[in-house]
Amino acid sequence: MYKSLLFCLKIFVFLILVGCGITAYIIYHYSRDLPDYSQLARYYPPSVTRIYSRDGKLMEEYAFERRVFVPINSVPSSLIESFIAAEDKNFYNHPGVDLFGIVRAAFLNISNYLHHRRMEGASTITQQVVKNFLLTNEVSLERKIKEAILSYMISRVFTKDQILELYLNQTFFGRGAYGVAVAAQNYFNKSVEELTIAESAFIAALPKAPSELNPERNYARVKARRDYVITRMFEDGYITRDAAKEAMDSPIVLRKRAKEETVTADYYAAQVREEVIRMLNSKEVFYTGGLTIITSLDAKMQQLAENSLRKGLREFDRRCGFRKPIANISLDNWQGELKKLPTPPSLLEYKLAVVLDVADNHVEIGLIDGSKSKMPIAEMKWARSNFKSVKTLLKKGDVIVVEAIKEGYALRQIPEVNGAIMVMNPNTGQVLASVGGYDFSTSKFDRVTQALRQPGSLSKTFVYLAALENGVKPNQIFNDGPIEISQGPGMPSWRPKNYEGKFLGEITMRTGLEKSRNLITVRVATAVGLTKIVDIIKRFGINNEPKKVYSMVLGSIETTLSRMTNAYAIIANGGKKVEPHFVELIKDRNGKIIYRRDDRECLACNVSDSNLDTAILEIPKEYIYRVTDEASDYQITSFLTGAIDRGTGYAAKKLGKIIGGKTGTSNDSKDTWFVGFTPKIVVGSYVGYDTPKELGKRATGSNVVLPIFIDFMSNAYKDKPSLPFKVPDSIKLIAVDSATGKITPGGTVIEAFKVNNVQMLENEDMIDNQDNNDIFDYVPSKEDQSQEIY
């Protein structure tokens, strides 16, 4: 008996030794080519880059993997306990591999197999870290062995908190969310610190099947999985019975990010993306670096700019008349047929409808949701001039675009024309709003920065400015009559015309710009010379290499809305160089500032909120680079404010603000523009077809684009004070007759003369012979409503 026991013991010891030897060999064999796990100590996961408006609203997120790194000491204990209960009960006690868990799972899975239940896994959190970081998802014995070896080795080198930090930040939770921080934001619009026990349990339940555990598709299954995690938390002693019951009784309510926390600015965000990638010289850093980018964007102005542009494009498109229905379908199953139709691009808030019945003064329409409504003829009047019966416009089965209004629905169509709008601070160059087209989802081409178009009359401003720089006085008389320009041997003479083909005769230079007279502009250009005009176009950044031809003075050069708006920003700020910029600040994933647009002292920091709108934050002199002298700049500003009060921008006068501005219309009305400004804001807008063609015989900047500016300013600037443009010491204000240009105390316009020219004026025949010693010391009274000062 004793010998038998001894023999069995020897066999047992031998088998143990053999087993240990085999185990040692396996460990040695598979340890030779293990990946380097020391890299985990240098964990910098790909993280989402977020772009914000200047008032902290989220504009856009960019990432290969949407992740925000959160350190373990910022993760609440309830969330950690949820994962421990759900994934690895013995996490704090085992050495990376849970042998007891493996045995338990093996016996449990026998029962699960017999009862057709889901199999239990025994993979620890450490093993999942190894699989996610160091190995592939290959299902093989070799991978499992390597996984176990690495898990043990990692547990000896890294603390449990370090392993948890890796796991919680790397794991995929569905809906494009990597890591618990983005999961909390995606599902509940909360930070991890704000999660309840029930919400923590929900997130901890996701890694098992993140794509399948969707409460919007399978609520019962998701709730059962969440409640299982809560039960485990109670059984493991993390929460009380009452807390568990309360958590299980709570419904799963997903919450999206609140609308007021975000701003839609797709074109702006795309411009920021390109700008930052250029700055960093790395697309990878942008998409993986977890950057926080603060921009110049004003969320309110951005929304208003987008609304104004879309409204203006739609109104112009409707003026061109109704094109045709989208399709014609059978009414037998009209709802089903309507659903089959592809959604037209750029439908936005509009809806598709089918005409069910047609009467003389209304139509009955059906919508995709099966509802019906009547649309009166009054909401279709724009479609065709002087039509009296709807039957001449639409028929049964026609598929049309409609817009919901208070009284029902109105006939609409998606504009074919496109355009852009840009809003700048002229003193800092901050781009406050930028909308590069009607709909970003349909066309990502940015018409603010990418579209090269002819500015038409917008370029006239710089012809007149060149004249003022070179000593031509603002009351100089020019002849608004026919002119012929020689273009050299073998070339036909150039005979420019005014827009409407009429002549005004002898008028002042000011009136020439205010009324946008082509022939006056050409005569001013001949007086100054093309060389100086080319120079000023370059200086203001409108075009770097303009062709030295006379047609350029009427706008035949090409430029972008961004360049042209910036050129007018220089005028608005008194002639100082400024460049448009979108990005204010960039922080890396750790909050370290890696870029700041301006390191100068914050000039606005000591200005109270109540005074901010009236404060003009000037650039310190050591930072100033002048593009033009302040006297000439003030003179052209005075001309441009006159264009609003008496000229082509007159419609904007109803805004009740001191505004300068200029319309622009290119040859054949292919491009229409308007740029308007105050001392604090510059707004540029453009409308035209992407493939240039005539907008219409009577289409001009005044009737196509100026309404966009007016709509924007009436909403964005209605509560702002009207600020005057600062009169420099080098300017003398003198009353003149706007018709003759002669200086007179009873003049209808207060003209801005350079101080060094005033003495010369006394010797010229431009002064009415009146006995008035104060003619050159005019100080207007507030009561004098007939004279205007800018």
Curated annotation (Swiss-Prot):
Localization, UniProt: Cell inner membrane
Protein name in UniProt: Penicillin-binding protein 1A
Function: Cell wall formation. Synthesis of cross-linked peptidoglycan from the lipid intermediates. The enzyme has a penicillin-insensitive transglycosylase N-terminal domain (formation of linear glycan strands) and a penicillin-sensitive transpeptidase C-terminal domain (cross-linking of the peptide subunits).
UniProt xrefs under PANTHER family: BINDING PROTEIN TRANSPEPTIDASE, PUTATIVE-RELATED, PENICILLIN-BINDING PROTEIN 1A
Cited SUPFAM superfamilies: beta-lactamase/transpeptidase-like (SSF56601), Lysozyme-like (SSF53955)
An annotated GO cellular component: outer membrane-bounded periplasmic space
A GO term for molecular function: penicillin binding
Top-rank lineage group of the source organism: Bacteria
The protein's Enzyme Commission number: 2.4.99.28, 3.4.16.4
Stretches in topological domain Cytoplasmic: 1-6
Major localisation: membrane
Family: In the N-terminal section; belongs to the glycosyltransferase 51 family. In the C-terminal section; belongs to the transpeptidase family.
Gene3D superfamilies associated with the record: Biosynthetic peptidoglycan transglycosylase-like, DD-peptidase/beta-lactamase superfamily
Record NCBIfam families: PBP_1a_fam
Keywords linked to the UniProt accession: Antibiotic resistance, Carboxypeptidase, Cell inner membrane, Cell membrane, Cell shape, Cell wall biogenesis/degradation, Glycosyltransferase, Hydrolase, Membrane, Multifunctional enzyme, Peptidoglycan synthesis, Protease, Signal-anchor, Transferase, Transmembrane, Transmembrane helix
Pathway the protein contributes to: Cell wall biogenesis; peptidoglycan biosynthesis
Pfam families linked to this entry: PCB_OB (PF17092), Transgly (PF00912), Transpeptidase (PF00905)
Catalytic activity: [GlcNAc-(1->4)-Mur2Ac(oyl-L-Ala-gamma-D-Glu-L-Lys-D-Ala-D-Ala)](n)-di-trans,octa-cis-undecaprenyl diphosphate + beta-D-GlcNAc-(1->4)-Mur2Ac(oyl-L-Ala-gamma-D-Glu-L-Lys-D-Ala-D-Ala)-di-trans,octa-cis-undecaprenyl diphosphate = [GlcNAc-(1->4)-Mur2Ac(oyl-L-Ala-gamma-D-Glu-L-Lys-D-Ala-D-Ala)](n+1)-di-trans,octa-cis-undecaprenyl diphosphate + di-trans,octa-cis-undecaprenyl diphosphate + H(+); Preferential cleavage: (Ac)2-L-Lys-D-Ala-|-D-Ala. Also transpeptidation of peptidyl-alanyl moieties that are N-acyl substituents of D-alanine
Periplasmic side of membrane: 28-790
GO terms, biological process: cell wall organization; peptidoglycan biosynthetic process; proteolysis; regulation of cell shape; response to antibiotic
Lineage: Bacteria, Pseudomonadati, Pseudomonadota, Alphaproteobacteria, Rickettsiales
Topology in the lipid bilayer: Single-pass type II membrane protein
Record field: transmembrane: 7-27
Cross-referenced InterPro entries: Beta-lactam/transpept-like, Glyco_trans_51, Glycosyltr_51/Transpeptidase, Lysozyme-like_dom_sf, PBP_transglycosylase, PCB_OB, PCN-bd_Tpept
Region: Transglycosylase, residue numbers: 49-220
